[in-house]
Amino acid sequence: MMSHSPSMPCSALFLLLLLLLPPTFKGGSLRYHGPGWKLFHRLSKGFRSSHQRQTQQMRQNVPQGQSGDDCQGIFDLYLVLDKSGSVADNWIHIYSFAEGLVKKFTNPNLRISIITYSTEAEVILPLTSDSKEINKSLLVLKNIVPQGLTHMQKGLRKANEQIRKSTLGGRIVNSVIIALTDGLLLLKPYLDTMEEAKKARRMGAIVYTVGVFMYSKQQLVNIAGDPDRCFGVDEGFSALEGVVDPLTSKSCTEILSVQPTYVCAKDFYQVNISGHGLNNTSNMKQVICRFKFSDSKVVDESPSDMNEHSITCPGPKIKHTGEDVSLQVSLNNGISFIGNKLIITSTNCWSPRASQGIVFKRTWLMFLPVLLVTLLLLCCTWKLCIKPKKLPPPPPKPEKEPEEESPPPSSPPAPGRGPGPGPSAGPGPGPGPSPGSGPARSPVPARPPPAPLPANTNPTVIVACCGCGNRGMQGNLDTCCDYFHPSCHPMPLVWCHPKAQGGYPGFAVMKPSCSQASCRQKHCLCSNRDCFHLAEPPYPTRIVFQPNEKYFSITQSHYSPKIRFQTNQESLPVAQTLCSKMCSPPNQECYTFKSPQSPYQARYTKSPARMLPLLPPHTRQSLESLCHTYPFPPISKGPKF
């Protein structure tokens, strides 16, 4: 026989997978109208918008020289361009560079200002978000003729004036300055430029520098304040277009998404802000996460971690369910903020049986089918690879169960008491009628015969006797007078089992209580189990005892002598020295004592039980005189049962 290790059926896993796939991949199938049903409805929208923004972030975060995506950030952009005489005929490349940057910043809320400088500075386009004004200024820029000295500090001064004006007007946004130069700055202009750059950074602006042709790398780094915000073009003016994408990626400061967008009311949480250009700050201490509640309450939190693309901030508790909180981020210690009003909504995550709320995310469900498929494959692989275990064959059933040995049959009931005293030995169905009483009671119905014992079983018979001398176990018995002596108390006669088949049966006398009477002869027992013969007188004698009467009669006939007394239904062989048949009046069962000269074939009787005959004194005297009177054994006609 073979058996496999217990495992979950593959069909059950496959059925579970089929049941869970439709609600996972079908957007409109996730319907729940319990306390938090709005949570799942908003999660679907939040997941789609977050996925789109993360895709844009991946497109913008590309190495230098590769095409990036447009910038969707909201801030103020200032382009400060060099139009000094050293540019000469390469102005067209500077114009193409400016035009490429303007086209990369496509957010309609982004404001742009274009400034040119040489000996003096000029504002071509004041700070505006109007696309028509931006296009007109580009046409004006294209027709400019370069001339004059390189005084970058005057161009930065024009930018700082607009930043200051914008801040006083109540618009708090981030400012980005991109300054281009084509040569080395003299000492005085360089020092003045350094001072204007510091003023811009103090107002929250981020300064990027681009050098082309004969520029000083160290001057540009000092003006920008950070080596990462400095770009150099060594291949000439024509290579300016190659730095548009990396410069856009670096200068584009924007917030792409915030997670989670739904939080549990009255619970602490953390927000992860994803974006671009988030490292455009000199120190993490200048970064602020500002939470604005609907009741004009403002809570500022410092970030616990940040890098170029993400900021992690702890969030304040939201007391009311369904309340919206806007989030903004400042990279310059609160001077300006970036973010297009990111919204965080509180939901009821509490249940009667839960101590803490749980924020459910739809993205978790995306991994459930993968997990089920993995379990299904593992289950099938296990069933195919595992070797079946061979179990030992069951033991063969026995052809025939051994028969249980039946207990020996119960002892027969003792005969009724005669006129004389005599205790009964052994159990019986009921006491016999007492002398002098009315008619005898009806006999108790006989029990069904017990199961037959094996053929070689020899039972034990107990016969009343007294201590009449020495009795051997191999068949030596006294005469009838010894068994039924008047002076002896009734004792049981015991039929003992022979040690081997075919041996002589033995008699055991129980507790002899009287002295031995004078007996004249001994008789030997033969192995016949049916009956035993006594020396029969020349003429037959019939002796009948009535248990409840005090008389008996002896009649001579041609039949063998018979002795009647009350006993049970089983035949009981008695010693061969007896010369009579003993029968009980109620059931007429006889015990025949057969002489050795009997022509009848010996038969086995039923398994004899115990017999405890108790004879009155008159009966014992009659049997004793009978044995002395008739020494010759008669021939019995046959056994009777």
Swiss-Prot record:
One Gene Ontology cellular component annotation held by this UniProt entry: membrane
Segments on the Cytoplasmic face: 385-641
Keywords (A to Z) from UniProt: Membrane, Metal-binding, Signal, Transmembrane, Transmembrane helix
GO molecular function, one term: metal ion binding
Region (Disordered): 391-455
UniProt topology in membrane: Single-pass type I membrane protein
Record flagged with keyword Membrane: yes
Cell compartment(s), UniProt: Membrane
Positions contributing to a divalent metal cation binding: S84, S86, T150
Name of the protein in its database record: Anthrax toxin receptor-like
Source organism per UniProt: Mus musculus (Mouse)
Gene: Antxrl
